[in-house]
Amino acid sequence: MNMRIARRFFALGLISLGLILMTITSVAAWAASAPQVKTKSGAVEGRDDGKVHAFLGIPYAAPPVGDLRWKPPGPAPKWTGVRKATDFGAHCMQGKVFDDMVFHDPGGSEDCLTLNVWVPAKHSAAKLPVMVWIYGGGFVAGTTSEKRQDGSHLAQQGVIVVSMNYRLGVFGFLVHPELAQESGHNSAGNYGLLDQLAALEWVHENITAFGGDPGNVTIFGESAGSFSVSAQMASPLAKGLFQKAIGESGAAFSRSGLSFEPLAVREEKDQKLVTGKLGVSKLAELRALPAQKLLDAFAPPQSEGFDFGPDVDGYFLPEPAPAIFGAGKQNDVALLAGWNHDEGGFEITFSPQKPAADSMKERAQKDFGDKADQFLKLYPIDTDEHVRRSALDYAGDRFIALSTWEWIEAQSKTGKQPIYRYRFDMAPTPSNPNAPRLGAYHSAEIEYVFGQLDSKADVTWRPEDRQLSDMMQKYWSNFARSGNPNGPGLPNWPAYTSTDGWPVMFLSDQPAAHKDDLRDRYLFLSAEWAK
């Protein structure tokens, strides 16, 4: 009996020893295969899933805390040894503003200036094209850790994908007279845009170590990220840091939802805001406040959350973007840009009313006076369906489409590089049959571009959705590679020129190029709103 027990313990001991050795071997194998890269600040170790090497949460600038709050980003601190880069960095301070952003709880950290790099695990190119993503969120929300913006699938198209966090809301865009005085160039605000610029400088200095080409960088973004792309094109500070640009829904033009106001206007407005809500007005007092107190004062429910945004500061933006593009002073790079078919809901234009023929007439008279009849020819209201569609179209035009069109139009007049325009028409199908059908709504294209359809669980994804996602990843990465989205097996996407009738690529279950049949509408709106 004792011998039998001894044998059993001996056998169990061998099994345990085997498991321990297997674990040690597995850990050693993982450690040996974990990719390492030496950046200017120090070595980083990422993770390898067999398809992509991911390096997450790499600091690209000094933490903007304490006396560095509301200052342009400084150099990232150096470190010794190997820094683990296997987890996303903290998201920047923000409140809960958008229901579709389910990636985090409100809050975050001021120490948030990190970026992520996704590199194809196997590639033959000596230098890979680089795509730098700028998230949207109205300049008040957003983070790189949102799953639908994960670059691991897109990188498998043979590109390096980079994404960065940047300061938001009051932390990224406060304008104050004392900030202008201490700046050295009499400017204030736009710290979030300067963060983006610092990330681009980091890419320029470090991406070669990851196998990327610093001379072939494409910036791309959606909504506020697209506004940012147009602003980086307009900024003389960004010259030479990127060679191509992709804008998805938005630009720093026209009466968009995110207007870039003059410095003097913002100084007065922001001072009233901070004094009224915080009871302090001196810069030293504001810098001494806890970050959470600042956030709580300007985030829902205390505010709608949109009190602070970019301004024409005289430094990052010497003039408004339309003036810079109009004079041909922009960073002239190849541009791919467009918007979604259903960018805005009725509430943007008609809240609290529902659209009807009479309310459309009232709106036309209010907005365009003696040109109301011309407006109604462009937005017909002769049937209930036309009223519904025209109300949606006008809401989307006011919110996003017109500003994006004006950006494309300005670049076509003074730029010399090719332009490709699209309209995203694919309407995701809700899994819940009782859920509202929102069409090709604002931001709907993000999952397709990144190949992250499965990140959105409340949608029933069809084979047509997956096919379009595959095409869009190829179009976007081809454009990043060569400045031309076309490639083998893809429907032809002609450049945006008057010779071909200003063609627009409709991205749907049957992607195809069409002549622009809405040009008169945008010419009318642009001319009227310029008055």
Model-assigned labels for residue ranges:
Residues 2, 29-190, 214, 455, ...:
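Non-catalytic accessory segments of hydrolases
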Residues 167-170, 220-224, 423-430, 491-497:
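Short, solvent-exposed turn/loop segments enriched in Gly/Ser/Thr/Pro and often Arg
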Residues 11-26:
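Bacterial N-terminal signal peptides
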Residues 97-283, 315-350:
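Serine-hydrolase-like catalytic core of hydrolytic proteins
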